[in-house]
Swiss-Prot record:
The lineage of its organism: Bacteria, Pseudomonadati, Pseudomonadota, Alphaproteobacteria, Hyphomicrobiales. This is tRNA dimethylallyltransferase. GO terms for biological process: tRNA modification. Residues 57-60 are annotated as: Interaction with substrate tRNA. It comes from Rhodopseudomonas palustris (strain BisB5). ATP binds at G32, P33, T34, A35, S36, G37, K38, S39. Keywords: ATP-binding, Magnesium, Nucleotide-binding, Transferase, tRNA processing. Monomer. It comes from the Bacteria. Pfam families: IPPT.
Amino acid sequence: MFGLQMSVATSDMNGSDPGQPGQRPAAVLIAGPTASGKSALALRLAQARDGVVINTDSMQMYRDLRIITARPTAEEEALAAHRLYGSVDAAVNFSAGAYVEAAAGALAEARAAGRLPIFVGGTGLYFKALTRGLSAVPPVAAEVRDAVRLRLDRDGVLALHAELARHDPAGAARLAPADRSRIARALEVVLATGRPLADWHNQASPPLLPPEGFVAMFLAPEREALYGRIDARFAAMLQAGALEEVAALAARNLDPLLPAMKAHGVPALIRHFRGELSLEEAAAIGAADTRHYAKRQFTWFRHQLPEFRWVTPEQAESGLLGT
């Protein structure tokens, strides 16, 4: 397979030179949709290879939400070193830049100890920042973004594409005229900053991980089996205390636009507490939202990080652990 019998054929995973036999990778990156078994695999690998499991999931950063985000349990964390789990308060709007800074510290700690860094999670933007660097695009003012979206709905995507061609001809030429989201994004950036989006991307910060030597995979279970696991897991979360966890979060009266307040299942359960939904309805919505998110994860990684090798959980287990 693409094994990590502690000699890593990295060329099998990301196209880089495998190096000498017996070479250990600089890091292992395990991405995949929610409920695909990533965390369990990372834990077994950490136990077998003296590794450190480093969180790469934006929602598992929040300490208020262990159960509803399927964060590793305290018992699992005791079995191997885990970093960046539950390290951020729910009141914080934690950015990708803040994640990269925290991940750099965890990576340096693992390297200093001679341990294998194992990045695991489902947040594509975090993996992209680790392997390609963080975009230098400054925040776009809400009024600019809202105006562009309003015109997109009112005038249509072709009108926006024509306007983009006037401001950023090269950028417009790279985009399909019907690509609504990318055209709107490119137009809002050039209107807000006066510079094409490509200029900003060219100023991206250097990646935290070198382009050679790491193993990168995307766990891709069979879809229907995955969706069944998502439904079963959401029901198990409710039995394990997710209701009480979300109730405690709701009692803090935080801004509903904060990332932690939008974790899958949280909005629906808060509506249940307000009497707007029955528990059964809230559970169905939470599970459905999670299934839809898993679908988006498949699509995002396929288009945004094609260098990640897609494997079944069984192939990943065999390749990493030789089982």
